[in-house]
């Protein structure tokens, strides 16, 4: 494992200089989820949530979050993203439903897009919670994790199941 590079000679935080890093295509896929009641699942599926199209709004929120990651993660470099795709899948679990969220982010640059994908997945889940909390505040946001990344000096990564 490499040493941390986000500290200067005085031990204080710094943004890493990436100007000498090779420009390559970089991708990242992050996942999150939110567990909801059958009532919320039905209301989302039938577009009966008062705040509007939950999945449509959450998808846009995820894309916006990916684009603004450097505004909320202090040492994250601002990146020109080439693409962001937020997708959903439902999984029934006993009497509840889990909304699975997957975010794919792509750029061509000197640093990776893992944080953008993770931020987008998190914000997508938070947006679903916000839009549905009037129905039930007991929703549970699940684990958020990096599934895969490609490109860059550290090489490719694929999470073990």
UniProtKB/Swiss-Prot annotation:
Pathway: Cofactor biosynthesis; molybdopterin biosynthesis. One of its GO terms (biological process) is Mo-molybdopterin cofactor biosynthetic process. It comes from the Bacteria. Its EC number is 4.6.1.17. It catalyses: (8S)-3',8-cyclo-7,8-dihydroguanosine 5'-triphosphate = cyclic pyranopterin phosphate + diphosphate. The active site is at 130. Gene3D superfamilies: Molybdopterin cofactor biosynthesis C (MoaC) domain. HAMAP family: MoaC_B (MF_01224_B). Homohexamer; trimer of dimers. This is Cyclic pyranopterin monophosphate synthase.
